[in-house]
Amino acid sequence: MKASVHPDYQTVKVTCSCGEVFETRSTLCKDLNIEVCSMCHPFYTGKQKLVDTGGRVQKFRDRYNMRTGQAKSKE
């Protein structure tokens, strides 16, 4: 195996925009700034918003049912 093929694996400090700071290991030699972490991401905090696709689904179902209904009445 070749010596010194892999870069150094160092501890870096990660800072989130919400203020959370934690340490991890990386081949980067500088500290990281991130926008979202597990402390502020809506999925992990339980504050996620559900997108209302019911209107689009209902519109599709109405259009599909109308076409199938017309095909049956022509027979």
UniProtKB/Swiss-Prot annotation:
Cofactor(s) needed by this chain: Zn(2+)
What domain of life is recorded for the organism? Bacteria
Q: Which InterPro entries does the UniProt record give?
A: Ribosomal_bL28/bL31-like_sf, Ribosomal_bL31, Ribosomal_bL31_A, Ribosomal_bL31_sf
Q: Which family does it belong to?
A: Belongs to the bacterial ribosomal protein bL31 family. Type A subfamily.
Its annotated function is as follows: Binds the 23S rRNA.
GO CC terms in record: ribonucleoprotein complex; ribosome
Record-listed Zn(2+) binding positions: 16, 18, 37, 40
Q: What is this protein called?
A: Large ribosomal subunit protein bL31
A Pfam family of this chain: Ribosomal_L31
UniProt cofactor note: Binds 1 zinc ion per subunit.
Q: Which GO terms describe its biological process?
A: translation
Give yes or no: UniProt keyword Nuclease: no
